[in-house]
C-alpha cells in the first residue's frame, strides 16, 4: 500500500510540473493539398495555397472555370454615410469533404470591423453535368459603421476570351448577342462592365454563355423556389431591407474573359428598368441587406455544362435543365369558377366614357383603381369578345345586368 501511495504522489507531481518540455502545443489546422468532388463533367477542385487559402477550379467538357480575381467569395459593402461601396474578396480558409459534398468556409472582416462568415456547400450531379452550390452568409459582428452589403458568385473561363468569342442567353432578355435589342433594352450595350438583370424579368432565372470555338456552354441558374419582396420595393433609390430575397443574374464583362454573375439581393445595372426604361444611361437600381447580426442571407445556385454544335440547341438544353429543376406543379382548378370570377371582374369594371361603354385598359394594384381607359389603344381589340361572354352568361342565367352591359358594348363597338 505504501509503494502504491508513493507512486501515486509521483504521478501527481509530474502532472502538476511547470516543466515546459512536457507541454504540447495544440495541433494546427491540417490542409489537404487537393480536394475534389466529381470526375470531370463537372469536377470541382480545391488546391491549398499558402498564405492565400484554397484556390477553386471547376472543370467541365475540357474547359476550366475559375472565380473572377481568384476570389470565390465576394462581398460589396456600403459604409454608413458613404455613397460608394468597397469590395472584399476571400478564398476558402477551410474545406472538408463529406461523402458526396464539399463544405467550405471563408471569413471576411471589413475595415471597420464587421465580421462575415460564408459557408458554401457543393454537390455534384455527374450524370446531369451539374454542380450545385448552397451558400449562407452570416453576419457574426456588425461594427455599426457598415450599412449594407451584397454577396456575389462570379466565374469565368480560365483562358482569356474576347467578349465576341461567346454567345449569350438570358431568357426573355438576351438571345445570342445584342444585335436585335433596342437601345434601351437590358443587354443592349456590351461595352458596359456589368449586365445584371433581376430574375423576375426572366422566363427562368438563368444566364448562359457559349464559347463559339469549343462549343462548350456554361449556365448559372438560381434555384430559389420562394422569391420574396414587398410593395414599396420600387424605383431607383438604394433600398436596404432584410425582407428582400431574390437575386439578379447576368455577366461581368470587364474581366479577362466574360464571367457569369449572381448577385444577392438582386441589384440591377448598368442598365435597369427600375426607372421605367427608355434610357441608355449607366444606372443602378441597388438592393442590399443590412449589415446586422441575424439577417437571413442564403441562396442556392446551379452551374450547368453542355457541349452542343449550335447555339439554339445549347439554349434549349439549358432551358430544359432549369425548367426541370423547378418542376412547377400543375394545379387542378375548376374552370367554371375561373370563368365566373372573370365575368365578375368584367361586370365590376364596366364603365362609360363620354357615353361610350367598355372596359378600361389598366388598373392599379393592389387598390384596383382604374388607371387608363384608352379606348383607342391596346385593349380595344378585346372589347367585343369580353362583351360577348358577359352577354351570353346573362342570357344563360337570366342575369339582366350582365345582358344589358354586354349588349351596350356590342351595340357600340360592333
Segments (PLM) and residue ranges:
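Bacterial Sec-dependent N-terminal signal peptides
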Residues: 15-30
